[in-house]
């Protein structure tokens, strides 16, 4: 009896290949938008064959989240205790850059894990953060070592949040240098309070459409777009669910409006911040001050725009992505004027590193807004950029 040709060619590491492919799909599309068929296609098998390895999409998703954490833990376990900060952050950087395509699973999508799996994942990442924190404090015994450690990891992890094409070795070097600068920055030493930030006020809801949008944003931020129902949104504004359709064709159109509102507010803030700056260095600092202020002031809106844009259909996502690119282009231009040795790709990677610092430092501070917190995060962002 002849052997099954499919079995003969089946790779021994198929399960690993499936998890790798799934990580890319979950990171790119989000947990709810990803399908088993898309994941199976990435491995060249049928969805039915996928179920031989994983009973459902959630089990596969949990395995993906676990894998990234395990890789980081393993890489740090290979670094001797007491090793220098460059060795510790270098290990994290190499793993993160090598697997950047699946890195978004942890940053945004881990909220969809159940409580037990989330607790398990937090324990593993706690080990990673602890090693980095210890090395930061040992090498740079300054205040706020936990904040600096979180921010340094944010610079490294930012590589998973964009698609800038750059050689792995160059990305490793660029992000490691950025993270080391962040770790060496004293958040209390630089005060940006000399610069006044004039952010546009979030529009006051004066129409039913605006009221629906204002009610939906905190729900999306708290529970995730996919978990929020039309009924919840309608209840928040005192409407019947069917009445929402008079103002928006569907729930996804509310999300698109939120993403565009976020882009619009940030663009207005940038325009104001660059008015009357005296040179590229001041321009980059002004951009950093504005982005940090925006992140603290519009935390829910910003988290929705960052975490949920991948779930928009192509026609609704296009204008949002265009607005985001225009914003990044402003940063890139000013950073290259301030640091002429950078090429466009290097500058773009560093801009995203700055955004990553703002996100993780803000999270570490639980987004508790105060002038001191804004100044501290701004100093760390500027450090990440190399100014």
Which residue ranges define each predicted feature?
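C-terminal peripheral helix-coil segments that are non-catalytic and often amphipathic
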Residues: 1-2, 126-141, 162-226, 367-387
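Amphipathic alpha-helical packing segments from all-alpha helical-bundle domains
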Residues: 115-140, 146-147, 174, 315-339, ...
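Conserved small-residue-rich
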Residues: 198-266, 355, 359-362
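Hydrophobic alpha-helical connector segments
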Residues: 77-102, 272-299
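Helix-turn-helix
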Residues: 17, 21, 25-59, 223-253, ...
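Generic hydrophobic, amphipathic alpha-helix propensity
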Residues: 14-22, 39, 64-68, 72, ...
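Amphipathic alpha-helical segments used for helix-helix packing
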Residues: 93-119, 153, 295-315, 355-356, ...
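Hydrophobic, ordered structural segments
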Residues: 68, 89-115, 136-191
């Amino acid at each position: 009896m002849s052997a099954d040709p499919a079995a003969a060619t089946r790779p021994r590491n198929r399960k690993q290949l499936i998890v790798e492919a799934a990580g890319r799909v979950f990171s790119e599309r989000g947990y709810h938008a990803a399908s088993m068929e898309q994941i199976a296609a990435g491995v060249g098998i049928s969805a039915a064959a996928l179920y031989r390895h994983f009973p459902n999409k959630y089990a596969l998703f949990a395995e993906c989240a676990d894998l990234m954490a395990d890789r980081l833990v393993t890489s740090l376990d290979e670094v001797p205790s007491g090793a220098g900060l460059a060795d510790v952050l270098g290990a994290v950087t190499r793993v993160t850059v090598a697997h950047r395509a699946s890195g978004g699973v942890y940053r945004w999508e881990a909220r969809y894990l159940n409580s037990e799996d989330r607790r398990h994942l937090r324990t593993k990442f706690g080990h990673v953060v602890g090693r980095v924190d210890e090395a930061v404090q040992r090498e740079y015994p300054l205040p706020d070592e936990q904040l600096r450690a979180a921010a340094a990891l944010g610079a490294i992890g930012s590589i998973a949040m964009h698609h800038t094409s750059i050689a792995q070795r160059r990305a490793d070097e660029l992000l490691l240098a950025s993270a080391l600068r962040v770790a060496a920055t004293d958040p209390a030493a630089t005060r940006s309070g000399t610069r006044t930030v004039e952010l546009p006020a979030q529009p006051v809801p004066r129409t039913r459409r605006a009221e629906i949008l204002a009610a939906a944003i905190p729900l999306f931020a708290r529970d995730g777009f996919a978990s929020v129902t039309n009924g919840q949104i309608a209840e928040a504004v005192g409407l019947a669910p069917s009445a929402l359709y008079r103002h928006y064709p569907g729930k996804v159109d509310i999300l698109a409006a939120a993403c565009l509102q976020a882009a619009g507010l940030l663009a207005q803030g940038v325009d104001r911040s660059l008015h009357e700056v005296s040179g590229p260095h001041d321009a980059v600092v002004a951009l950093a001050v504005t982005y940090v202020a925006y992140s603290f002031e519009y935390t829910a809106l910003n988290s929705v725009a960052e975490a949920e844009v991948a779930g928009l259909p192509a026609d609704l996502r296009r204008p949002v992505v265009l607005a985001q690119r225009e914003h990044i282009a402003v940063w890139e231009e000013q950073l290259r004027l301030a640091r002429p040795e950078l090429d466009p790709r290097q500058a773009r990677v560093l801009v995203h590193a700055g955004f990553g610092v703002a996100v993780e430092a803000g999270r570490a501070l639980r987004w508790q807004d105060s002038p001191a917190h804004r100044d501290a995060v701004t100093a760390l962002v500027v450090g990440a950029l190399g100014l």
